[in-house]
Amino acid sequence: MNFVFISPHFPYTYWQFCNHLKQNGVQVLGIADAPYDSLPNELRESLTEYYRVESLKNYDEVYRGVAYFAFRYGRIDWIESNNEYWLEQDARLRTDFNVSTGIRSDRIRSIKEKSEMKKYYAQGGIPTARQIRAAEGQEAVRQFALQVGYPIIAKPDVGVGASGTYKIEDDRGLQRFYDEVGDYKNYVAEEFITGEICSYDAIIDANGNALFESMTVWPPSIMDIVNLRLDLSYYVDREIPESLRELGRRTVKAFGIWNRFVHLEFFRLDSDREGLGRKGDFVALEVNMRPAGGYTPDMINYAHSIDVYKIWADMVAFGESQTQLGVQLYCAFASRRDIYQYLHSHEEVLARYGDRMVMCERMPELFSAAMGQQMYTVRLQTMEEVNDFVSFVHDKKL
């Protein structure tokens, strides 16, 4: 089997996908724009061959890389990056090289555009926030806001995270949005929903069935964390509620997902919401056809005593995985920003949680706006311990 892995060096931990593919007898063929000597040793040892391009954004260059691999090794069976940024290019490459193991260009809108996602949620009978395209005009959006109530959220139709997101509180704020955002036609506006963000993180086989499922609980507003420079914490739950499991599986079926690691986001309502559900119910937010960001796959491993990199590679190579869950724990992440003075020193955090700490490091600059500069990740038995850990890391000096 020939597997072309696009950008296998980023995020850093993706070498583990490549390593398990190699262990499963797959030829892993890497394409990226980083010098070969800069690749981690673990990645270099996992690749059959590496093709460097000047820029991964140059489709012609990447195309030539895949063509070279096809000439040298024969038919390409898989093309994948597991990276949001390259999903559209991955689909185009699959289309051009007739690779049928993943999404092609004719399906890409359904997983990239928030406005398109709504159609599939509706087909699956999955509750989701009401939405309108900003391109319909200011008055149409104002009428929408009167219907669902201010505030509303405006965000790019294509995009992830908090980048380019606006919380609009009233008609004056709506006017400012249209005055100041030059590309407003590429935005959607949604009703503002309050509650925890919970993700259904799963590995889906060729038949659309889940080989592995987990839940991660995120802060309610990454936008506020970035804009207000707040501290970040989140955790992987030791269990997944049956209601989220059922909604996650329905979403997979509605979108026709197969052969993928998915990160499907839902709100868990913190109050009754007419037309959507009661407090504690899950409401769909958006789909992401790749693993959760940062070190979340590793946190999932620590929470469930498992290896999702291996499960995914088993899915690719064999269509199944025999990996069994181990001890179930919470895995919690909390980070700090260098601009703040904290009540407990770095050394005190290590002294208190060192025996349960699984990761402790400085965050890459690319992630620091959302995730801070110093992170701590621990395995814990109870939700009370999770809350105590977050408080201990985040409490500040007066």
Label the predicted regions.
Residues 1-106, 383-397:
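ATP-binding N-terminal substructure of ATP-dependent carboxylate-amine bond-forming enzymes
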Residues 15-22, 118, 142, 178:
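Short amphipathic alpha-helical segments and helix-helix/interface helices
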Residues 50-57, 132-136, 166-169:
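Short acidic-hydrophobic, aromatic-tinged amphipathic segments that line or gate anion-handling sites
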Residues 69-76, 146-148, 182-184:
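Glycine-rich phosphate-binding loop signature in dinucleotide/nucleotide-binding domains
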Residues 94-164:
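A conserved helix-loop-beta module that forms one wall/lid of the active-site cleft
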Residues 127-131, 151-154, 163-199, 221-232, ...:
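Conserved ATP-binding module of the ATP-grasp superfamily
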Residues 172, 191-257, 261, 268, ...:
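ATP-dependent carboxylate/phosphate-activation module, predominantly the ATP-grasp catalytic core
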Residues 311-398:
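Peripheral (often C-terminal) accessory segments that flank ATP-dependent C-N-forming ligase machineries
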